[in-house]
Design a protein with these regions (language model features):
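Auxiliary tRNA-acceptor-end handling modules of aminoacyl-tRNA synthetases
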Residues: 54-72, 91-95, 103-304
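Ubiquitin-like/PB1-type beta-grasp interaction modules and other compact soluble beta-rich domains
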Residues: 1-83, 88-98, 122-123
Length: 304
């Protein structure tokens, strides 16, 4: 008989009695192996598997291919983006997951070229293969300021708790501050970031279903009066087949892009001197314009 105190929880809708202090990884170990569980929801909030399950918690497993799982996968991918490895003096912005992918903002760096993207992705694949663990640490504001003393954007997030920063909820929130370490197999820390998490247990689970897609300029906190940053975008999926299917969908959509077809068929154009998004129909596009106008008239008549 274990001397460990017992607690009551709800797992997948059913009551369970477990030892106090047990982690999600231990509680869900069979589902981790059988069903590809990579995280858990605790009282509705996504958590890392290495966190201890509290008494009274409602626990639900999160699989990699689920919506929550893909969001965690994509956020974890930002933590293997080896930009700081290539440019040690870069200033770290924010790195949230977005629809179908992720991005990370960087300051004090020149425009990112396609060659740089290829090199960053190459290094990401190496980090994924290494199987670095994502380790969560609770910190105080003073500890955060000390650890991130050379990172002005992170210091600002600590001070303001992310107020007004697009995507900053992945870094800080209303609760305490946390850091995530990328820990190598030998126990050394490869990289650290201010982050709320959650993350996958290991970089290896990111797999090969990711790719960097593009870069662009962005403003810190989305404010045009703020610093100009470089934003690197990527996409990530549960499998490489899912990635290829996504890339195929994008390629097919590009073929049907109305801007591309309009120019190729000499139907219309968007002259820059007139203004962005303002269409000029060509003679060959007269019938198309008529059909669009008639559709609008018909809809107005239908709805009175």
């Amino acid at each position: 008989m274990s001397d460990q105190p017992m607690i009551e929880i709800t797992l997948d809708g059913a009551p369970r009695t477990i030892e106090a202090g047990i982690t999600g990884a231990l509680l869900l170990q069979d589902a981790v192996k059988k069903d590809g569980v990579v995280a858990m929801r605790v009282n509705g909030e996504p958590w890392d598997l290495e966190r201890q399950v509290p008494a009274g918690a409602v626990v639900e497993p999160i699989t990699l291919s689920s919506e929550d799982g893909l969001n965690i996968l994509r956020h974890s991918a930002t933590h293997v983006m080896a930009v700081q490895e290539m440019f040690p003096d870069v200033n770290l912005g924010i790195g949230p997951f977005i629809t179908d992918g992720f991005y990370y903002d960087f300051g004090a760096i020149d425009a990112v070229t396609p060659e740089m993207l290829r090199e960053i992705e190459k290094r990401m694949k190496r980090i994924v293969k290494e199987g670095q663990r994502f380790v969560r640490r609770d910190i105080t504001e003073d500890q955060g300021r000390e650890e991130l003393a050379d990172q002005p954007y992170k210091l600002e997030l600590i001070t303001t708790k992310g107020a007004g920063a697009e995507g900053a909820s992945v870094e800080v929130g209303a609760g305490g501050l946390t850091m995530y370490d990328n820990v190598r197999r030998d126990g050394t820390v490869a990289w650290t970031d201010l982050c709320r998490g959650p993350h996958l247990p290991s970089t290896r689970l990111i797999g090969q279903g990711f790719a960097l897609t593009k870069s662009s300029s962005a403003y810190w906190k989305g404010d045009q009066s703020g610093d100009s940053l470089q934003r690197i975008y990527g996409t990530a999926w549960a499998t490489n087949d899912d990635l290829k299917a996504y890339q195929t969908r994008l390629a097919e959509a590009a073929k049907r892009d109305h801007r591309k077809l309009g120019a190729e068929l000499d139907l219309y154009s968007f002259p820059e001197e007139i203004g962005p998004g303002l269409v000029v129909f060509h003679p060959k596009g007269a019938m198309l314009r008529h059909q669009i106008e008639q559709y609008v008239v018909d809809r107005h008549q239908d709805y009175g």
